[in-house]
Design a protein with these regions (language model features):
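Enzyme catalytic cores with a strong preference for nitrogen-chemistry domains
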Residues: 1-232
Length: 232
């Protein structure tokens, strides 16, 4: 066994604020500034879509973060949207600094991230025209993320609901990790139910679970499903 030091950054960005173009720099600076005191830990983790610029729009910022994390001996794991060659989007997590790799979400939320029977339903009902609702799935098999020497089995948002998906993600992972944006649930029981799903995956797989959220239950859970640290 070995110890891994982890810092989870929770931005608490309101959903109505998060995707407004004029707030992109403000949100990025919030996460960057919150991380300044955390460099030097093995893992620094930002949640799902922490950066609201598309990946190709954030090249300079990502290069700067990569340099900062590497200088500190840290791996920075963060969520960022990416464009697909088809014109759609991909919900992506990347590793900067002391690590490498990317993960693209494999199981999308119906009507939230994609519209079933899109040719018939898109435009028919206004609700189906949500921002970022034209996502493209990632490959069924993807290389593991490597962060500070750890093989990560990653799931994004509601992917953690599915035991088979988490189990099949990476063979013999060192750690499980899930990132999410739970502002969609508002003040309901949703964030807590989502968190309990993550705890179950830790227990089932006998691996510690790292969970970072924009607004929800951010936590470290050990291999027995026992909560070791939690926000809020």
């Amino acid at each position: 066994e070995r110890t891994v030091s982890v810092s989870l950054i929770q931005g608490n960005i309101d959903q109505h604020v998060k995707w407004q173009p004029q707030n992109r720099r403000l949100i990025f600076d919030l996460y960057k500034n919150a991380s300044e005191t955390e460099w030097g830990r093995d893992l620094v983790v930002w949640p799902e879509a922490a950066i609201t610029l598309f990946r190709e729009q954030a090249v300079d910022a990502l290069v700067d973060l990569d340099r900062r994390a590497a200088m500190s001996g840290s791996a920075l794991v963060l969520g960022i949207p990416d464009r697909h060659e088809s014109g759609g989007f991909q919900n992506t997590v990347i590793v900067l600094g002391e690590g490498e790799g990317q993960y693209v979400k494999r199981r999308l939320v119906p009507f939230g991230e994609y519209v079933p029977l899109e040719d018939y339903l898109r435009g028919l009902i206004t609700l189906f025209n949500l921002p970022m609702s034209h996502n493209v799935t990632g490959p069924a098999k993807q290389p593991p993320l490597i962060a500070a020497g750890n093989r990560l089995s990653l799931s994004i948002c509601y992917e953690v609901f599915y035991p088979d998906l988490v189990r099949s993600s990476v063979e013999s992972p060192d750690l499980l990790m899930t990132v999410s944006n739970d502002t969609w649930f508002g003040s309901s029981f949703g964030p807590w139910q989502h968190f309990q799903m993550a705890r179950m995956r830790a227990l089932e797989n006998g691996r510690a679970m790292i969970r970072a959220t924009n607004n929800g239950v951010t936590a470290l859970v050990d291999y027995r499903g026992v909560v070791q640290a939690r926000l809020p």
